[in-house]
């Protein structure tokens, strides 16, 4: 692992561009520091190589930060789910790229905007569907929730599996 000081004010794509001189392999990984997952990195890389695209993003399910209520046309609540897993996938923050990806970046690039959208437009982005554990730690509340899980012994990201103590059906 090589740590590179890319400065706090550098956009995400610019940060990746700044590490180009350290990447000596045909493929390289980018991982966000705010995601916690039991994703099999070896399988993600195998999938990336099998797909043959410039980029691969781990696609994960996210939990809604809000309760979801469905209301019919008369104003009756027909369902209520507290912070359910959202349909579809989000960027899980584990990505694999071919060296060619550096050509899509400059020092002002925001990785999640133009560079990834361009890969999609060109048919060069794959999505690895991860159905296991994934959680983000963007807020103090997220930190508290993840630490509570750890204290209760639910640690799928380090190999221990079991039913989470209060996530209900969110994982």
Model-based region annotation:
Residues 1-71:
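Conserved beta-loop-beta/alpha segment of the NTase-like Rossmann-fold superfamily
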Residues 27-29, 36, 41-49, 61-64, ...:
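Catalytic-core segments of class I nucleotidyltransferases/pyrophosphorylases
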């Amino acid at each position: 692992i090589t740590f590179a000081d890319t400065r706090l004010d550098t956009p995400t794509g610019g940060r990746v561009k700044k590490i180009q001189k350290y990447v000596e392999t045909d493929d390289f990984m980018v991982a966000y520091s705010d995601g916690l997952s039991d994703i099999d990195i070896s399988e993600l890389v195998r999938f990336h190589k099998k797909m043959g695209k410039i980029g691969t993003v781990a696609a994960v399910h996210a939990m809604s930060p809000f309760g979801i209520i469905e209301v019919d046309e008369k104003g009756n609540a027909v369902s209520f789910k507290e912070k359910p897993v959202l349909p579809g996938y989000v960027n899980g923050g584990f990505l694999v790229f071919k060296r060619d990806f550096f050509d899509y970046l400059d020092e002002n690039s925001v990785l999640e905007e133009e560079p990834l959208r361009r890969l999609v437009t060109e048919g060069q982005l794959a999505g690895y569907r991860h159905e296991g554990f994934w959680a983000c730690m963007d807020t103090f509340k997220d930190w508290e929730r993840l630490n509570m899980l750890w204290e209760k012994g639910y640690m799928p990201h380090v190999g221990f599996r079991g039913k989470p103590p209060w996530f209900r059906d969110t994982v």
